């Protein structure tokens, strides 16, 4: 039984989507990636090869017209009425991680997080998951903005994950 419908922003080749769709409960798939967005045509081509059932957008999240995505989410909600919608965002992080000395290399890419609110307001996801480096939380009062954007129906809850996938250490 599908319990979660994922929208994967910044989808890349599909590693996160593969993990999402591999989730099982009592041997049954519980999550399905229904749509993906990335500005890079090569990333979308790779993701589409790995996840052909998802709706793919070769678009910048800052400029994507959400009408088609909204319509697709509504169809998916009707197909899986008990499922919760999850907005997953793996925002660009390489220019902010300690791997590059912790110094900001591209301040404009920080604005990508601000564009999530447009998706939150339009899609009204049940859950929002943001994956990024710990320095992400030093950019400003993002946690407060997320709670405010959820109109009091959500909560900011950082997860500290010790190992994911190939033994990567994440927080």
Model feature map: region roles:
Residues 1-171:
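Conserved active-site and SAM-binding loop architecture
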């Amino acid at each position: 039984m599908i319990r979660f419908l994922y929208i994967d922003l910044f989808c890349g080749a599909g590693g996160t989507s593969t993990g999402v769709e591999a989730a099982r409960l009592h041997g049954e798939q519980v999550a399905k990636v229904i749509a993906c967005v990335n500005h890079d045509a090569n990333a979308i081509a790779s993701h589409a090869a790995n996840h052909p059932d998802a709706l793919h957008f070769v678009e910048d999240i800052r400029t994507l017209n959400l009408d088609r995505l909204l319509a697709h989410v509504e169809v998916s909600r009707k197909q899986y009425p008990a499922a919760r919608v999850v907005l997953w965002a793996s925002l660009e992080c390489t220019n902010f991680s300690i791997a590059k000395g912790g110094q900001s290399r591209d301040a404009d890419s920080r604005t990508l997080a601000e564009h999530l609110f447009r998706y939150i307001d339009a899609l009204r996801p049940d859950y929002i998951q943001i994956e990024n480096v710990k320095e992400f939380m030093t950019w400003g009062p993002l946690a407060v903005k997320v709670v405010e954007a959820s109109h009091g129906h959500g909560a900011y809850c950082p997860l500290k994950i010790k190992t994911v996938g190939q033994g990567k250490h994440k927080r």
